[in-house]
From Swiss-Prot:
Its main location: cytoplasm. Its cofactor is Zn(2+). Keywords: Activator, Apoptosis, Cell cycle, Cytoplasm, DNA-binding, Metal-binding, Nucleus, Phosphoprotein, Transcription, Transcription regulation, Tumor suppressor, Zinc. This is Cellular tumor antigen p53. It comes from Tetraodon miurus. A motif (Bipartite nuclear localization signal) lies at residues 282-300. It comes from the Eukaryota. Residues 262-279 have a biased composition (Basic and acidic residues). A motif (Nuclear export signal) lies at residues 322-333.
């Protein structure tokens, strides 16, 4: 029985008793921190309201902030059609290729006559970069491929699907690669979709005047679904970190199985075309003979041939035949008749009186 009379102090039945026992001081007795101004004057409240109403509303308050540029995009101001003219700039940006000849065993060779690089698939080509003075800190070298012909220049140069599927790299769709540097970065412009690769510019080593970069092209020029025998140009630019172009060089590239043979063939064809053009100019400069003289000689010769040619004429009726035969015989007789001899004029002077001089044995008309 004693256990039943015991009640828990925090049970629902005893909560009201507990709440009643809680004592709290009245609000009026609570001390608050003293303010400099215990009350806001009416004038101050009015001034604040007017200032708030006069302030203009910023319409750009709720606009989204622009997204930071992604690493996949190059310079956002990249033109739709890149410039292909050479521009050395104030730093004297130049390129130089190794001389390797036209032997069949070479994997890369450059033609100065055609300004064209011939190389094998995925084989490195050494390119020497020369500058007149040091560029700004953080400068980079960028390589971009575009199509040469006007009808193809708007298209993006990519690798063919066959070579892409055989590659597991993240940048497997890029045609150009820069080998030998772990700091190479591959970009695809978000708007033009053109692909490029960059490496930081490194100053020449001690005792050298140039910096060497290694380029490799990962698809043949004849690959279906890729370049498909369309000629391409490689644009190599010197840029700042912000993408400002400091120098530009451009050269044509052909990726083939036998660079030496193709270079020799194309150089021969180019020289032949230039010689033919010079010969054509020389022929145009030589004065042509008078066309009227040629025309007259041709007309005279043709008329003579027509006169000597024999024709056959079919005639109906004996009487008509006899008549035409007489006409033909008369024409033949007239043509074969010897020309009349010219009047014989005696040699020697003629006397002033008009009388003919008598020769020995001749008599005068008066006799």
């Amino acid at each position: 029985m004693e256990e039943e009379n015991i009640s828990l102090p925090l049970s629902q039945d005893t909560f009201q008793d507990l709440w009643d026992n809680v004592s709290a001081p009245p609000i009026s007795t609570i001390q608050t921190a003293a303010l400099e101004n215990e009350a806001w004057p009416a004038e101050r409240q009015m001034n604040m309201m007017c200032n708030f109403m006069d302030s203009t509303f910023n319409e750009a308050l709720f606009n989204l902030l622009p997204e930071p540029p992604s690493r996949d995009g190059a310079n956002s101001s990249s033109p739709t059609v890149p410039v292909t003219t050479d521009y050395p700039g104030e730093y004297g940006f130049k390129l130089r290729f190794q001389k390797s000849g036209t032997a069949k065993s070479v994997t890369s060779t450059y033609s100065e006559i055609l300004n064209k690089l011939y190389c094998q698939l995925a084989k490195t080509s050494l390119v020497e970069v020369l500058l007149g003075k040091d560029p700004p800190m953080g400068a980079v070298l960028r390589a971009t491929a575009i199509y040469k012909k006007t009808e193809h220049v708007a298209e993006v140069v990519r690798r063919c699907p066959h070579h892409q599927n055989e590659d597991s790299a993240e940048h497997r769709s890029h045609l150009i690669r820069m080998e030998g540097s772990e700091r190479a970065q591959y970009f695809e412009h978000p708007h033009t979709k053109r692909q490029s690769v960059t490496v930081p510019y490194e100053p020449p080593q001690l005792g050298s005047e140039f910096t060497t970069i290694l380029l490799s092209f990962m698809c043949n020029s004849s690959c279906m679904g890729g370049m498909n025998r369309r000629p391409i140009l490689t644009i190599l630019t010197l840029e700042t970190q912000e993408g400002i172009v400091l120098g530009r060089r451009c050269f044509e590239v052909r990726v083939c199985a036998c660079p030496g043979r193709d270079r020799k063939t194309e150089e021969t064809n180019s020289t032949k075309m230039q010689n033919d053009a010079k010969d054509a100019k020389k022929r145009k400069s030589v004065p042509t003979p008078d066309s009227t003289t040629i025309k007259k000689s041709k007309t005279a010769s043709s008329a003579e041939e027509d006169n000597n040619e024999v024709y056959t004429l079919q005639i109906r009726g004996r009487k008509r035949y006899e008549m035409l035969k007489k006409i033909n015989d008369g024409l033949d007789l007239l043509e074969n008749k010897p020309k009349s001899k010219a009047t014989h004029r005696p040699d020697g002077p003629i006397p002033p009186s008009g009388k003919r001089l008598l020769h020995r044995g001749e008599k005068s008309d008066s006799d």
